[in-house]
């Protein structure tokens, strides 16, 4: 049953082949084997077109629609499962007929109608029927559980795939308002809920319904007069349960939506953990996360009374039905309208079984409710029709492309800010096979034009044409495959360098190439982008893992790999959005030469703030406020002395030295790649694939036993002691209902052995006792539902919050591990507290009920008659417990292994969606889809194998009570026949043991809950108890500036990253920086500049040597207080969910007046832009702030840093994303901000450091030159060559 489902044939258009939605390629990683079929754009589900037009699904309607997601084999399995479940549900009602016969036999023997020999013979004969029922039920339960589990696994796999596919095909406007970071939460949590709701729970529900119906059929055949009034309890119970389930579904949907939004915040936070740590923003972001949790808790608490009513009404009606059946049955018997006492008991026990079936059905309805809420979310996404469908087969596909692009009167506003025109009637021509450069201020619309050319958005009015054809008429995927794009902030996937570069090739081309050809193309592209040398320097070369979003490479290395990816397919159009912004001058010159070469034969659109990269362009277009204000060549624009001339002058870099006759030796221009790139080798070479590393990092699972975990949890949640205590007391009292039932039923059975004139009196009394028991149950189950649900949600809120705080409190080295990617951690933060909550809610009360009842009925049986009790108990419970134990062990092992594998697939999906612009520009949607399917294969195959074996034990534990009945009747009958027991003793023991066996069976129905909760509790407890060596340390107050003349001192500092301790990044660094000095760090990409900033922020501790701050060792200073004295502006800025105001205030703990916020923004040249927005400072930043341009984000980050008024200012390419004018203004603001504080700036754009008090030139982890700008120029060494490469004069 493990074969892959065959896809339903999708609707095809224009002769295109369909995308295989269920049979991904066998490639082990993204891109190794591309999909061989083109996406058709039609969702692969029955009646997809109709579904697309429907309104959002709600509750059970969404759950019902899940069942359309199946293949023919799944339909067959479900039909088999349905009939097997129905047949197994009839077993117990059929048993009541045999039970009625037993009662008549026992009564006949009790009044002396039959002899002992006849009694034993009839008992033995009828006991065999119980054995037959056991065998039949065992087989049927196994069949229905395995059938429904297999189809659930297969269907949810398909849902996961289609959910990812649906997200990937959405237009960019959707992502401006939707939080892509929540994909890990949604895909993990929702898929788990849906699978639970479609697995054996469906069979259990069908079994319960069949049991209910067949029980009443049996009851009606015995006596319709008695059954009819009692049957009125069923619609009453169903109505109440239906109402409460509907209310529960609405609350559950709201809770899931809030958790999804919280998951987006978590992913943003973990994905930019360095910014969070540097700014001490953990507390502020934790409060925002807590606000989400508080809202979810509010709805969760409202579920308390709903579930309380649901549980209590169900059991109250059930016990009232028992009372009514016996009371009215006695009346009918005395009136001669029913045959015998055995008939009454057959009807009574049929009703007992029928109403008890509601206890089987009700828990499954809760799972169906959760599955329906999750399905609502999933199906709404799957059925959403994108405005620009990247997978659509519609549109023209010209056979050739010349490359003429034209924008005619293009007007555009971003959907998130429709009142702000980003482009205002732009008219421009981009001629084929020419280089056209776009320059201008940040926010002038340059990158927006790139987005329109990629057709991420459509203009509000006007048109964009390619070779005279409106791009709206072209096939979206075809259009994007004609374009190579390198973005300002390049995104690489957590895979090998080889695979990342290979993504630039169209999937159908990859499928037709052999491995040798693919590697040849990849290497050639890397040679052209100046990436081959540093790649070859890695131990694993092109098979080096680059980390999440390429984080294990330096910025320049990422950029060069991205350039190689863009040119490998030799596209006719090349879009370069700040393509060389992250490169050092030497690498920039070489890469620029390569870009000049590859641009000669194609249409190239170049966006740049660094004007040295555009002066050779055929046409330079100057933009301002969404309009074209100048255009021409570099020379002609300089001659006009207009806006462009001003921009060039602002970037001029003096090459004149005070003493040109210096005889300082000139440094060689050559740099051995294997030395130059050791930094990258250290950071990026991970020889283990993600799931193998994950296995190493998760060796703490189940460090504590479940009992100890619960003790820790209850101790920590002692403030909710009253809720847990009242829920626990209610559970204990409810557990006593089972032995009470045993006593009452035994009294009822033996009532018919009394004189006839006592029947009415005894019948009234015992019926009244059942009603009293029903009132007790009403109170106790209401208490369980209310108190434990409220306590669970309150506890869950605490552990979600604490888990998040524990994660963001870890050192940066923790996040460097591939197993701890933001996607994986977000998925864990979603599933682990949820699993713990599921146990702490009413489930723990039900488990306690089962334990109490099992102990109570066993004690009652032993006290009543130890011989029969021992035989019955040991004949029933040991095999039951053995089967349950084996099943639990298997579930624990499967849960451990699958959790890691599903985390890896969730990480992969999250990374792809968070990089949606890169995915869409490379038309990787189908590749991501297929490789995501590959990552699902292992957990799916493992689950199928586990299901086939584990369900044997499930079936046995679910049906062994029938075999125990056979043993109890046979042996009990023999004891009675020899006069050792009377009928009352026998029935007390028999019913007690049967109820005990059923209770023991119920406890193993919670094994998956307890297994998941056990693992979750250990994860949470372990991480919370894990003290981070750096972030968790305490120390002394930071030294004052008066304690030392030297602000920062490096003494023989050497460093290697924890993931590669054998690869040194910094080697014996020695430098002194005095108070108030402005220092620049320059050098080739990967030389260790950013690593020094990381050490100064104390993201890591040095391997050897010391860093002194104001004369005091950095390791002796309290890390939190030290970081409060520093601000960091990094190369890739990060904004978070929330308003602009909240983002600027990130990490600031004091109350800041608006005037101070406004001044910081004015200093960063962003205030005017902010107040031009309709909502001003209250404008929502959106997911990662992507609705703002790169320059706008950078200026907001600069304002955020300035607001802290730090002693130390660390600038890591702080102005790299700014246009010339903004750079000039921000640079002036930074110059102003530097006064009175120590500043260390990392820069490739040397114009930003030429006025520094000291410049340190790094190479291969060592300082090779130092001095002022003029001093270094006089040496005509490494720095001089770098300056020369960036010269902007006409002769350069």
UniProtKB/Swiss-Prot annotation:
Catalytic activity: itraconazole(in) + ATP + H2O = itraconazole(out) + ADP + phosphate + H(+)
InterPro entries reported for this sequence: AAA+_ATPase, ABC1_TM_dom, ABC1_TM_sf, ABC_transporter-like_ATP-bd, ABC_transporter-like_CS, P-loop_NTPase, Type_1_exporter
Pfam families: ABC_membrane, ABC_tran
Transmembrane regions listed in the UniProt entry: 79-99, 128-148, 202-222, 226-246, 314-334, 344-364, 720-740, 768-788, 844-864, 866-886, 949-969, 986-1006
Main location: membrane
SMART domains linked: AAA
Positions bearing carbohydrate: 149, 494, 820, 1009, 1031, 1052
Induction annotation: Is slightly over-expressed in strain TIMM20092, and azole-resistant strain isolated in Switzerland.
Every ABC transmembrane type-1 domain range: 81-370, 725-1012
Compartments in which it is found: Cell membrane
Gene3D superfamilies linked: ABC transporter type 1, transmembrane domain, P-loop containing nucleotide triphosphate hydrolases
Record GO terms (molecular function): ABC-type oligopeptide transporter activity; ATP binding; ATP hydrolysis activity
Annotated ABC transporter domain residues: 405-650, 1048-1285
Region of interest (Disordered), residue spans: 1-43, 656-691
GO cellular component labels: mitochondrial inner membrane; plasma membrane
Any one biological process term the GO annotation gives: oligopeptide export from mitochondrion
Topology relative to the membrane: Multi-pass membrane protein
Ranges annotated as biased composition (Basic and acidic residues): 663-680
Binding site for ATP: 440-447, 1083-1090
Keywords carried by this UniProt record: ATP-binding, Cell membrane, Glycoprotein, Membrane, Nucleotide-binding, Transmembrane, Transmembrane helix, Transport
Annotated family: Belongs to the ABC transporter superfamily. ABCB family. Multidrug resistance exporter (TC 3.A.1.201) subfamily.
Function summary: Pleiotropic ABC efflux transporter involved in the modulation susceptibility to itraconazole.
Protein name as annotated: ABC multidrug transporter MDR5
The organism of origin for this protein: Trichophyton rubrum (strain ATCC MYA-4607 / CBS 118892)
